[in-house]
Curated annotation (Swiss-Prot):
Protein name per UniProt: Probable UDP-arabinopyranose mutase 2
Entry's family note: Belongs to the RGP family.
Positions bearing the site annotation: Required for activity: R152, R159
One GO MF term: UDP-arabinopyranose mutase activity
Catalytic activity: UDP-beta-L-arabinofuranose = UDP-beta-L-arabinopyranose
Organism lineage: Eukaryota, Viridiplantae, Streptophyta, Embryophyta, Tracheophyta
InterPro entries: Nucleotide-diphossugar_trans, RGP, RGP_fam
Cofactor (UniProt): Mn(2+); Mg(2+)
Motif DXD motif location, chain numbering: 104-106
Length: 366
């Protein structure tokens, strides 16, 4: 019919879940409605489970609180952090989709230099659906982006690239700084928009931030454990970075790629640097040993699945990091519990995206 328009189906509409950890009403979703409404949301409520979290009308979502987590996982719920955004990884576990996008509730829609709203989810999907180049660096960054290609001297034998497991997005406005840097630069804002996506080279670690992150759950999901943080733990704000160090070791071993760069979101508010310092204090010292450990970690050739790799890594954590603090013994045990819980909710041999959502609390489905 003349003049009629057909709305295109959003990319991966039935293959992607959006995971949001929160302690507050999700009014921020109104800004994201044009981009998020077609997708299924998994909301992980942290803190007091009796508090009512209001979600704007029209979104398709499941909401899990601590009571739900305890009911679904039983004793294994001990591996899920409480009073820390690390609780988001429970959403990764109960999802049955191939892809995950996770975002914090203080992250708003950013604008590109032309003033156009950035569809962060769409860019993450493009990043994940295109190969990565972890084995040889392309000086034009992502050669698979429109308008780019492999530069002269890039080996033809390596141009197929590697499957992309992780897409790590960035932030305008409030940078993701540690507490000491926050204290020194309280007014600093990130205003630089860099139009680039690049693959992090094999053998190189990076500080992963969980506030604007997407990944292929089938490729790397079992390793996306955000550790033991928050209530009852001696450390906080290292959840995403811990996961990032682990997934990079495993991606390097399995020949998978990790991208960073676009898309940007607008990080709306800075957290309290004094509160952050209390959470980070031990981690600031511990990371000086965790990072060399991760840089030198190797996995046996017979570790061919993410679960096998992660369990092997947990053994090495217990063996080599427990001398720093008993916390690492506890963390290594939690890593094993996490894999056991993951495998219980995600039996092997079944199509992950086709499994029924058996674990969803029916009264909280929308």
């Amino acid at each position: 019919m003349a003049g009629s328009s057909v709305t295109p189906t959003p990319l991966l509409k039935d293959e992607l879940d959006i995971v949001i950890p929160t302690i507050r009403n999700l009014d921020f979703l109104e800004m994201w409605r044009p981009f998020f409404q077609p997708y299924h949301l998994i909301i992980v409520q942290d803190g007091d489970p009796s508090k009512i979290i209001n979600v704007p009308e029209g979104f398709d979502y499941e909401l899990y609180n601590r009571n739900d987590i305890n009911r679904i996982l039983g004793p294994k719920a001990s591996c899920i952090s409480f009073k820390d955004s690390a609780c988001r990884c429970f959403g990764y576990m109960v999802s049955k989709k191939k892809y995950i996008y996770t975002i914090d509730d203080d992250c708003f829609v950013a604008k590109d230099p032309s003033g156009k709203d950035i569809n962060a989810l769409e860019q993450h999907i493009k990043n994940l659906l295109c190969p990565s180049t972890p084995h040889f660096f392309n000086t034009l960054y992502d050669p698979y982006r429109e308008g780019a290609d492999f530069v002269r001297g890039y080996p033809f034998s390596m141009r197929e690239g590697a499957a992309t497991a992780v897409s790590h997005g960035l932030w305008l406005n409030i940078p993701d700084y540690d507490a000491p840097t926050q204290l020194v630069k309280p007014r600093e804002r990130n205003t630089r928009y860099v139009d680039a996506v690049m693959t992090i080279p094999k053998g190189t670690l990076f500080p992963m931030c969980g506030m604007n992150l997407a990944f292929d759950r089938e490729l790397i999901g079992p390793a996306m454990y955000f550790g033991l943080m928050g209530d009852g733990q001696p450390i906080g704000r290292y959840d995403d970075m811990w996961a990032g160090w682990c997934i990079k070791v495993i991606c390097d071993h399995l020949g998978l790629g990790v991208k960073t760069g676009l898309p940007y979101i607008w990080h709306s508010k800075a957290s309290n640097p004094f509160v952050n310092l209390k959470k980070e204090y031990k981690g600031i010292y511990w990371q000086e040993e965790i990072i060399p450990f991760s840089q030198s970690a190797t996995l046996p050739k017979d570790c061919t699945s993410v679960q096998q790799c992660y369990l092997e890594l947990s053994k090495q954590v217990k063996e080599k990091l427990s001398t720093i603090d008993p916390y690492f013994t506890k963390l290594a045990d939690a890593m094993v519990t996490w894999i056991e819980a993951w495998d219980e909710l995600n039996p092997t041999g079944e199509g992950l995206a086709k499994l029924p959502s058996r674990t969803a609390p029916e009264s909280r489905l929308h």
